[in-house]
Amino acid sequence: MDFERYNARETEPKWRDKWERSATFKTDNDDPRPKYYVLEMFPYPSGRIHMGHVRNYTMGDVIARYKRARGFSVLHPMGWDAFGMPAENAAMQNKSHPAAWTYANIEAMRAQLKSMGLSLDWSREIATCDPAYYRHQQKMFLDFLAAGLVDRKKSKVNWDPVDHTVLANEQVIDGRGWRSGALVEQRELTQWFFKITDYAEDLLRSLDGLTRWPEKVRLMQANWIGRSEGLLVRFALEPTLSAPATEIEVYTTRPDTLFGAKFLAIAADHPIAADCAKADPALAAFIAECRLRGTSVAAIETAEKKGVDTGLRVRHPFDENWLLPVYVANFVLMDYGTGAIFGCPAHDQRDLDFANAYGLGATPVILPPDADPKTFVIADKAYDGDGLLFHSRFLDGMTVEAAQEEVARRLEEHPLGNRPQAKRQVNFRLRDWGISRQRYWGCPIPIIHCPEHGAVPVPAKDLPVELPPDVSFDEPGNPLDRHPTWKHVNCPICAAPSLRETDTMDTFVDSSWYFARFTQPWMEDAPTDPSAIAKWLPVDQYIGGVEHAILHLLYARFFTRAMQATGHAGEIREPFAGLFTQGMVVHETYRSEAGDWMFPADVRIEIGPAGRRAFDLASGAEVSIGGIEKMSKSKRNTVDPDEIIGTFGADTARWFVLSDSPPERDVIWTEEGVQGAAKFVQRLWRLIGELIFLSGADGAPKPQSISPQAAAIRRAAHQSLIRLEEDLDRLRFNRAVAQAHDLANKLGAAVGDIDSVEIAPDLRFAFREAAEILTLMIAPMMPHLAEECWARLGHKGLAAEAPWPQADHSLVVEETIDLPVQVNGKKRGDLIIDRAAGREAIEAAALALEPVKRALEGRPVKKIIIVPQRIVNVVA
């Protein structure tokens, strides 16, 4: 049997055209079937998709196609996270407009995504830079503002003095702006905030209900929210003529360690620090130095611990004669707690590093189990474990928990001034979400600043506030600030000359509700349609990288709650019922003799006695092979999806990214692996052809009786189908691929066993059934090949519209079972016996096994334990 090779270049575009012309994947909101909403995190339109996109969107597409075949009405949309800084950078470099660059990239990437054969409903396509999208975002901003969920206040930011813009913590590298290289300054700017902290407790507690989220993501969010129960302690300042206050408030989660206190430290931007700096040039210089560092927790934690003694002293809460020095320290954050801490060096490594640097000492107050109180000291490593209190007066001998309670009780009862010296308090690490960005290419904040009425909302009838197209990027900073007319407007209340808000929204806002807009993207008079929200949300399966575990996912959870509170989300509070975080696509790195990174396409790999060696295709020079790393432009270890699809076809690329490793782990891209996937495509094509040839044009009717050979074929097909269903239901894509491989191997062997020209009807039926099952099994993963095979089988309709095959579970029940047999808990042999055998038959057969007889050595049997269809244990 000779068959023409499968030609992906000709076949794949043909089927994509048929899907598009027949609107196969267009979803009707009125479809009465049960719903299933699958969504991959939408891409930024950078201009090219990468192999990470291929893997991410292939996984989502497999789920969408599988659920559609199982009878669900599937919503599987696509859009573009289209605002952001790269477009402005491109505008500066290319003297173009961000909109032109963005929309050109969208066109290019849409064509690339379509070439993958994704079952997307393109009629719902959205771009966040489209005024038709962001007008609704502006409306929700105003609704949030009216509901008290938006605030305007001053905040510390990373300021790039060259680019004249605020930088995110991630954009500050070694204290410098990532693009300009300028030393970053800390500035205090007035900014807009979403009050996500109003939902801190709810966001934390609701994590327990997200049972279809990875545990690591829930833990990351819980840690980011950072709920802590502690004590707000008021330390009385020792009165002096220059003392700027009477007390310093400290929030602590470890009041049990108060007797180990050696100092108080306040943040550089604490009000008391500012007052002290007025008369202390050295302190003023130190505060200025602190403002030149990044504001991220990571930057502060890794920096050398430095401080300046203010000269102020506070009294210990339990001993007014015990004075503690007050330092301004570079590791204390003003926006956590009160901006002041007490340092217990013996039991906090950060405090110990600081104390050792300034000779403040360390007195341990928690005694580890089995430690000797007479000899236990702290040198360079703080003790942060459990134990009993010592060196702590009335707390000595108590557990940590009991000591915390006792300190809280005493200080709550002890007055300082006319108030208790301490009170219990719950704190959160989570901070309100600052959304102001000094950028042009973002959603304008719909506010007008009036000299009389302050910040005034833009009337709803005047939305959207659109970006002016006539801007220049010849100078650094925000072009909206320099625009001669756009920002000048009259106040909606009093008509006085006023100014528009020139900050735009953080692009995380755009991606915090797009999943809701997809449910009814044609809605013009409101952001969402209540009936569509009720039908489709929450998203049943959301797919994306774990790098978005905190910010994007947490912001989307907050936004859904805010939408619900303002009437835009019905009763929905959680946006994503199921979350899957896929691994990355990684590749070897290559470097030339000159040390330059090289693209894999420019390298030839040879395998010889000395192992794998790489050579430059152009010069023939040997190239050094580096480590396997995430594909990145900087190290040039990227593979162009267009080249792979153009050479091998989309199905080959899809098959490889699904097959190589568990989906939550990284997949190593190798040329050998891709070629192996391409060979399997050809093998499947030949196998389906052989099965069709052997079964005849129409197969044969289901026979009344069936031969063992035909029964084995049917059993293999239905068993693989059942296992593949289980794997796809659990998102085990690599194991689903393995099931298809396994069935192909078994069917190939069965075809090879045929040695007669005349094929019995039962075999023809079995071959035909197996061919159809195998075709529909691969359809979610290799949809183009499946369509061609489906048509080859004589079907007039599309495989994409065919119902999922019904597995016959009765076929996969073996007539015999294999039972391990133990003697006194140690396995001695295996018993193959009829599945329907009774207890007496199993006991007799087990005792008749020669290994069991030898193990018993003539000893009498006390009892025989039988776990039905699992195991037999003979006790002697």
Curated annotation (Swiss-Prot):
Keywords: Aminoacyl-tRNA synthetase, ATP-binding, Cytoplasm, Ligase, Nucleotide-binding, Protein biosynthesis
Gene3D superfamilies the UniProt entry points to: 2.20.28.290, 3.10.20.590, HUPs (3.40.50.620), Isoleucyl-tRNA Synthetase, Domain 1 (1.10.730.10), Valyl/Leucyl/Isoleucyl-tRNA synthetase, editing domain (3.90.740.10)
Protein biosynthesis in keyword set: yes
Protein name: Leucine--tRNA ligase
GO cellular component entries: cytosol
Sequence motif: 'KMSKS' region, positions: 630-634
Enzymatic reactions: tRNA(Leu) + L-leucine + ATP = L-leucyl-tRNA(Leu) + AMP + diphosphate
Keyword Cytoplasm appears in the UniProt entry: yes
Family: Belongs to the class-I aminoacyl-tRNA synthetase family.
Organism expressing this protein natively: Methylocella silvestris (strain DSM 15510 / CIP 108128 / LMG 27833 / NCIMB 13906 / BL2)
